[in-house]
Amino acid sequence: MISHTPKELASRLRSQFPHTPTQGQERLVHVFSKFSISEKPRCTLIIKGYAGTGKTTSIGAIVRTLREIRVSTVLLAPTGRAAKVMASYSGINASTIHRKIYVGAKRSDGSDVYKIAPNLFKKTTFIVDEASMIGESSGLVTNLLDDLLEYVFSGVDCRLVLVGDDAQLPPVGCSSSPALQESRLASMHSLTIATVELTEVVRQELDSSILANAHALRLDIENADSEGKTNFPKIDLSIGPDVVRLPGLELQDTLETLHGRYGEEGVI
């Protein structure tokens, strides 16, 4: 698929990071450089990591590297919002999974039916962000994860990168995120899989009160005793200005103001 050696690819990818890669990102550089030239069937790379560990930076670096060596790249996400975010940090267009992999048709009774579209891409790397949101139902009486895999690997020499945070809430009806379970994917779909988990918080991200507090809470959970007991989470408002204590009586007015300023999709 790629004429470059793993060493050359690693050097190119490393140079695309805006900072010195963390240990986890350095491992990703190593794994991705081998993943990209592997001749094994149905090559899949899972990149896991919670907020602040540099997933976005890493995917941006990967996309720029693939473009530099002229490898076709398709960016996908489960929702329109996630696709917009992905496009903004990668610099190229992104689509929802549904829009890319399904094609509509009409039944004889006039009702709509959807089927998997033909994958006409060749030697293309598909990168799917927010993969933890991908469940086993698409709302179209079909299995979204299965359909995604069938679509991608029906193309000629195509590869798949799944990016997500398995600490996020899993899809409705699932106890965990099926798209991030390496053993399950390998056994049920005959994939050749490598997994890289980013665990170190990028130093710049700790300047964010939101991420710093989330990181502290995660450490509390991980350090809970054998009975699962842990201290009630405490929010540190002194880290930075992006966390504000909001009295309950002010919540509705604040939400209305923010919705008016940024729109409903811009406020969580």
Regions found by a protein language model. Name each.
Residues 55:
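Conserved lysine of the Walker
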Residues 4-9, 32, 40, 153, ...:
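Conserved helicase motor core of P-loop NTPases
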Residues 129-131:
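Walker B catalytic acidic pair
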Residues 39-45:
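Pre-Walker A (Motif I) flank of P-loop NTPase domains
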Residues 58, 62:
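Hydrophobic positions on the alpha1 helix immediately C-terminal to the Walker A/P-loop
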Residues 18-37:
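N-terminal pre-P-loop "Q-motif" helix
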Residues 74-126:
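Inter-Walker segment of RecA-like/P-loop motor cores
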Residues 51:
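The conserved Walker
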